[in-house]
Amino acid sequence: MMEVGGLFDAEDCFGAWNVYKAIEKQSPATSNRLVIGPWFHGQWAGADGTHLGNVRFGSNTSLWFQQNREIPFFNYYLKGKGNLDSIPKATVFFTGENEWHEFKIWPPQDVQLTNLYLQANNQLGFTQPASGNNPDEYVSDPAKPVPYTSGIHEDRTREYMTDDQRFTANRTDVLVYKTDTLKEDITIAGPITADLQVSISTTDADFVVKLIDVFPDDFAYEEDANTQKPGYIMNGYQMLVRGDVMRGRYRNNFEKPEAFIPGQISKVKFTMNDVAHKFKKGHRIMVQIQSSWFPLVDRNPQKMVDIYTCSDSDFQKATIKIYHDPDHASFLVMPVLHE
């Protein structure tokens, strides 16, 4: 069996990763392979896989997959040719460096779970926050939701999963945290966990967390000699690496929704889909937090009512506070790969 998926599969970014993991856990004797490329849904079969939106991947990743993984796999099972041992257990493309990596298992065994903390003054770092930090806050208004893309589209776009996030960074209902300029590469391999300490003024809210790669101010793509595609400037581009959402009422149990107590600090913890990305030296890591992502995610009335039957009058503003002090630290658990 071979599970094939895309890092930027807007239809099902969850499936391929987790089918592979489930088979490894529940049926370890099954011959099982995983291939993840920098693709949207089905891009490995229907497009060249050189780019998605403005972000380039350096080569025809779809053709590489077909020649080096798909054909050998079907030659073995359909024609009895070749050796299945030539196909690694996990083959994953890492954006940022634009390289394929081979692993004996996914997530790799040599990752170290590392906390990336929200800190004062919109800072992000690997050290615990200092004492005395006041929470950051914003007002989430369902009548003015944060859009998922800067353009106006009839259909949901594929490109939003690598879109430039600068269009939301200056909104007052989006919190932005970023590291200093990285002095060395940081490679992430596996699922990310968002662990937030929050309070809200109402009884429900959504929490959208976005992990972003901030390109240097002088970054530009050169002309591609293979494809003849012209170069272009990417100065300060804020590439969405992974984004996910937790509807707050389900923070403790998906079967038993639970209202928030207004003003009371609560933990909102959830697992985001797997990431395979290298944050390069000279870049920055950014985290954005918001409470709407419209129309990708339906609007939350921010009130503990049945969302499917509620009325317009149920939709209300909510003041959201995100805490980042030693007793109420908020952070992302990052699977850092040591190569």
Describe the residue ranges of each PLM region.
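Conserved alpha/beta-hydrolase "acid-adjacent" motif
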Residues: 10-17
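Glycine-rich beta-alpha junction loops
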Residues: 7, 39-40, 120-122
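Catalytic histidine neighborhood in serine/cysteine hydrolases
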Residues: 24-51
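C-terminal, loop-rich substrate-recognition/catalytic regions characterized by aromatic stacking residues
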Residues: 44, 49-339
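Acidic beta-to-alpha connecting loop that harbors the catalytic carboxylate
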Residues: 7-9, 292
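Alpha-helical scaffolding segments of alpha/beta enzyme cores, especially the outer helices
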Residues: 18-21, 72
